[in-house]
Structures are given as C-alpha cells and as structure tokens.
Amino acid sequence: LDAFETVYGERALVDYDFSKASLIVSVGADFLGDWQGGGYDSSYAKGRIPRAGKMSRHFQLEANMTLSGAAADKRLPMSTANQKQALVHIYNIVTGSSVAVSLEDKFNAEVTKVAQQLKAAGSKGVLVSGIQDKNAQLLVIAINQVLASEAFSTSGVRQIRKGSNAKVTQLITDMKAGSVHTLIMSGVNPVYTLADSASFVEGLKKVKTSVAFSLKEDETALVSTIAAAVPHYLESWNDVSI
C-alpha cells in the first residue's frame, strides 16, 4: 500500500492477470492462497494449460510451503531476510543497477538464473512479492515497470484495504505515552494479528477506556475494559451499522 501510494498517488494494491505471463516469479507471495484477497487461481490456471507445446513457468522463493510453492515448477526455500536480498539481486539484473546486496552464496546461482530469465521474458514476465516492506514493494513495482509487464495492472487496482502499519505503530506509541483516553475497536483483533502484540497490550493498559466490539471474547476483548457483543449476520438482517 505504501509503495503503491508513493509511486502512483493512490492507496491501493496492484492487480495481476497471470494468464498474460509466460514467466511468473513469486518472492514470498502465496498468490494461489488468500494473498491480496485471493482469486488469482483462475488467471494462473489459464496460463498453465499447454498450448502449442508451451505454458507459463513459475518460480517460487519462500520460507514455508504454500499452495503457490506446491504448484511451482521450481521452489527455492529461503528466509525472509534472504528473500529481500534476492529481490535486490533480481532488481540489479533486470534494471542493470548495482545496488549493494548480501545474498547468501548458496542462493546466488539460482536467483541469478531466475533474474536472467525474467529479464529475457520482458513484458511476458511478472514478479510478485508478499514481503510487508515498503522498500521491497518499491523494488517489485520498479522491476515490473522496466519489464513493461502485461500481467501487472495499475489501472484495475484492488482496494480491499487501506490500513497503515506506520499509523498503527504511532497509535501504540501514543497509547504507551498515555495520550489516548478512549480507544474503540470493531471488526479487528489486534492482540492476535499484530506482529508485536505485546507492545499493543502494554499500551492498551494505559488507555482509560478501551471498547472491543466482537462476536466472542477474543484476545483483544479479553484485555479491553469493555467487551461489547455484536450480532452475527443472521441476527442483524443487514440493518445494523457499527
């Protein structure tokens, strides 16, 4: 979101049409799962049907096994730290840049090969990444721009979320400083979903009134001063707004 907003001025997510790609390189993105809201399996499947002896090829660089990794022609297991360095290495080869990179030697040959094939694919190549880091996503955008990737769409963007990690971090800082008097939470469970939930809980304890609207006593509701029950969809008849 941050990277797309920086480049295109809109807080949204890039959409992809994998049926237009002859080479797909994924760095930590399970695009056959629920990545960016899911729904990419259909266009991916179209490109995987052999036509005239050819079909799309798929390289997956990831830490844990995913649906996308299982479907890939080549899967290269690596840590998130190495994935970031792999992105830089691919960027250097595709764009002809010389950004400093510290990729482990055991990955260098394979990543170089992938990058060279991606560059050769040109507009028929596409790179995606699930790394939650602005700089990493800026590299992804830059690589696809240089490739002029047909599968990379900035017109039909996905507006499924607009959250900001920076704003959440600032909220936690303000809570810890005692600057937040009342916090109302609805449809979220930050104590469970945030990577550094301990800091959130620490800050929440300094908020005088915290209200969690929830269907059940989840992790956030249990540590809030007020846990307010909300009706489920069979009870609300779509006439309740919170």
Feature annotation, model-predicted:
Residues 1-242:
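Cofactor-pocket helix-loop regions in the catalytic cores of large enzyme subunits
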